[in-house]
């Protein structure tokens, strides 16, 4: 079950990469730090409010629902706000100057390192590990093919599925979603047809930030500790998932995330639960897929597909 749980988190973060790439044909490498800020922001807010239940996790009832709802809301708000700030600072000024694509890449990587190092230097614990809030005790609910499935696993997988379903429905059925697809297909034509391209790009970053914030909340449920650089490895794997599934394709990001989680989990299991071996297997799988299908498994741009 761990593979599906990990894959669900990767898939949500991968959606942020694939949305921005679908609209701008650029990679938002600062998306990993949006994830990190959402995770820590939620943790600190809940801790300051006196709701940190790490020593005595809540199992049921309104206290659990209320704490989780508050933490999810804070994660999503911080994720969305951080992503919008990245767009305003690291992307929009460069777009106004018609800067080369390489400059966007450097700007995004610079923003990513700046955010991570700022938290590492000025955060309450600097570069030490933070004990993250644990909301639900890991009581086994049932076993599936000899795999232990607990309450947290179910919440993460179901939560990721709901968020992904909402996003697909939003992109396919809403007016803003149609605007996103129009800009992804041809920004100049969309602008001539009255679409506010700058606003659509901003909304795309915002939606990607919401996905990263939701992923950060779910990640916190299953992870007891995190550091200032927690977003780096998650971001690299989520980007790998997006490329594996076909970057620019929403369904591809979801498929890539789940596949990557399963490959990583089973790869680690083959060598005595060594997580580093699992990570190696996931990148080997990416190379193999790209050798035979350079565009990824579902390598179709978002503009040509109804996600």
Task: Give the residues covered by each predicted segment.
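Membrane-embedded helix boundary and interhelical linker motif in transport proteins
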Residues: 1, 24-26, 30-85, 269-270
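Membrane-interfacial amphipathic/re-entrant helices at transmembrane-helix boundaries
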Residues: 1-13, 41, 52-71, 97-102, ...
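Helix-loop-helix "hairpin" substructures at the membrane interface of multi-pass membrane proteins
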Residues: 6, 145-226, 250-256
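Transmembrane alpha-helical segments in multi-pass inner-membrane proteins
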Residues: 10, 68-76, 205-212, 218, ...
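Pore- or pathway-lining transmembrane helices of multi-pass membrane proteins that form conduits
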Residues: 33-37, 94-120, 230-243, 259, ...
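Alpha-helical transmembrane segments within multi-pass membrane transporters and channels
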Residues: 55-111, 255-260, 264
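Cytosolic-side transmembrane-helix boundaries in multi-pass membrane proteins
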Residues: 107, 127, 185-192, 196-199, ...
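Extracellular/periplasmic helix-loop junction at the C-terminal end of a transmembrane helix
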Residues: 111-144, 268-276, 298-304
């Amino acid at each position: 079950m761990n593979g599906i749980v990990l894959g669900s988190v990767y898939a949500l973060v991968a959606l942020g990469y694939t949305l921005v790439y679908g609209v701008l044909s650029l990679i938002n490498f600062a998306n990993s730090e949006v994830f990190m800020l959402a995770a820590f922001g939620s943790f600190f807010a809940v801790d300051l409010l006196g709701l940190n239940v790490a020593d005595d996790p809540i199992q049921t009832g309104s206290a659990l629902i209320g704490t989780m709802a508050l933490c999810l809301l804070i994660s999503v708000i911080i994720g969305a706000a951080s992503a919008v700030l990245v767009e305003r600072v690291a992307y929009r000024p460069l777009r106004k100057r018609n800067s080369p694509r390489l400059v966007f890449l450097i700007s995004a990587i610079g923003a990513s390192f700046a955010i991570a190092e700022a938290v590492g230097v000025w955060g309450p614990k600097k570069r030490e590990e933070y004990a993250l809030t644990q909301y639900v005790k890991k009581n086994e609910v049932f076993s599936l093919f000899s795999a232990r499935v607990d309450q947290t696993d179910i919440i993460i997988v179901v939560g990721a599925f709901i968020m992904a379903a909402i996003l697909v429905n939003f992109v396919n059925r809403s007016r803003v979603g149609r605007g996103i697809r129009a800009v992804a297909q041809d920004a100049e034509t969309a602008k001539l047809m009255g679409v506010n391209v700058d606003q659509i790009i901003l909304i795309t970053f915002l939606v990607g930030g919401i996905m990263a914030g939701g992923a950060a909340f779910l990640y916190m449920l299953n992870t007891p500790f995190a550091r200032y650089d927690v977003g780096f490895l998650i971001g690299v794997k989520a980007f790998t998932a997006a490329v594996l599934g076909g970057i620019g394709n929403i369904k591809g990001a979801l498929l890539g995330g789940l596949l990557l989680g399963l490959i990583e989990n089973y790869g680690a299991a083959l060598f005595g639960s060594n997580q580093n071996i699992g990570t190696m297997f996931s990148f080997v799988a990416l190379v193999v897929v790209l050798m035979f299908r350079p565009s990824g498994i579902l390598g179709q741009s978002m503009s040509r597909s109804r996600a």
